[in-house]
């Protein structure tokens, strides 16, 4: 026989962003607890609202599985004394297992006998094991915690109820002075205390007090209600997944409704309106069937439809206050002068250890100009990059960005166009923030991409120079994101700019405001981002080998990694890698700058390898380069079959090492082949 277990923890309102993660964490920890305690089960269901986290275990065994464990002890010669009696070592061993010497048996392992005991432990009843469930609750981790009343124990929010049912039987447990029972709380305003009759009636019991505890059902209710509004009003609603997930975790009983605002606010840029509605008020944006913004919004109430008219009016009033701010800043900011704003950036601190935003922009401008020489820009693009790098942060001092910081760059583009700047310049101002997340959109224009690269590169080098380096998960200045952006942009635009040379050049640029340092740490940090971009689908040995190459051009490195993955599936890969590894390992013994003297060759195989290396140009894409290199395998094999490298004649030995080094210098532009796994 099996039973179903219900565990519900009732709390004060949780922050929306932790609800789903906490629900999943509770489910995982309950599953681990049951497995560790040998309580079998069929499946686990999880539930959550802003005021509760819950788990239902389906098909929970009534008893633990019996435990039979074998323990190996000392060898027989240690376990028995000279009289054939059990020694103190043997007695201590069995006593530590809660047994007596009667349980001892001897088993032979690799020709020697050892003490073994078998321990039998009968399974406990599920109810007995479940008394430790509070330990699961106390083990939950949260990004923020608090303590309340006289509790020294910190938790995400104060705990109000604990419900633990095994079918219809309430278990007698305590957690943070809260005694378990069958009582749960209903909706804060519409519901009341409710008795959970049975683990199986959990959802239906809570529905009677206006709580939809299944997040999937709550989400579907929201979507269905929005769909009904779309049909009734002949409109289209932007369903932003992140916003939907947030709203889902703000309500226990959702009711969607549509509100309106004055048409005059549509004269304000759409991004301002969308930001006001979505980011600040958690409203869904409404459009007509052609995609044009309408003076409407969709919100979701935490409650039913009673007095919904009052709720709509209240939400409209709050939104209008936001839109008034947006309209005011839009009009006032247009009176500002870009050059005046740029001049004032000298008084804005980028970081107290690094200097002002003006100094950051000045360095960025020099780096951008240096990058422009590497990628080939038209005269028009060069002029646009030069102008954009002079002014690109000006919008940080506008009223709009001061109020809505999410619009930095976006408003810069709009104000730049209004001030008569070219479209190239304006676009670059917006795009220099991209990508703003690991999977975020990339710049589409060359000018924007170069400005983004230069800005991110100076940010990285500057913070490293003053020892503000990320450690562990701590990255307050988002340097990992900035560096990931650098790598993604280089890959997307196919710009094979050697990163090591680029960083070296940056360190040599003349800046009065800051001296870059920590070059090795910077390169290691960039390598970690390239490694992450390769992804776990690329085996670690291939990632390591490519990262150790001498050709630090991001697009080529990523392409080479993929080419080696493909090659590793071929029949000749293992042999080719083994022989190249041998070449690399021997070449490490060569002099610092070995010179090849063909007069010292003693056999045809040396000459053949020399000619093959001379003809090896590694042209084409990465796949073709790998194929060209692996094509030398037979020549390398013949060389090693007929040639001893480490001979007594120093001149001959060094000449052969020089020959191998010449192959390494070419092969290493792809990868450090002796780091590859050939097994």
Swiss-Prot record:
Q: Which UniProt keywords apply?
A: Aminoacyl-tRNA synthetase, ATP-binding, Cytoplasm, Ligase, Nucleotide-binding, Protein biosynthesis
Chief site of localization: cytoplasm
The catalytic activity of this protein is classed by the Enzyme Commission as 6.1.1.14
Reaction(s) catalysed by this chain's protein: tRNA(Gly) + glycine + ATP = glycyl-tRNA(Gly) + AMP + diphosphate
Any one cellular-component term (Gene Ontology)? cytosol
Please name the SUPFAM superfamilies in this protein's record. HD-domain/PDEase-like
The alphabetized list of GO BP terms reads: arginyl-tRNA aminoacylation; glycyl-tRNA aminoacylation
Which enzyme type, at the first EC level?
A: ligase
Among the GO molecular function terms of this UniProt record, one is: ATP binding
**According to its UniProt record, where is this protein located?**
Cytoplasm
Q: Is Iron given among the entry's keywords?
A: no
Q: Which PROSITE patterns match?
A: AA_TRNA_LIGASE_II_GLYAB (PS50861)
Q: Which domain of life is it from?
A: Bacteria
| PANTHER family (alphabetical) | GLYCINE--TRNA LIGASE, CHLOROPLASTIC_MITOCHONDRIAL 2, GLYCYL-TRNA SYNTHETASE
Tell me which family the UniProt entry assigns to this protein: Belongs to the class-II aminoacyl-tRNA synthetase family.
Q: How does it assemble?
A: Tetramer of two alpha and two beta subunits.
The protein here is known as Glycine--tRNA ligase beta subunit
- Please give the organism: Streptococcus uberis (strain ATCC BAA-854 / 0140J)
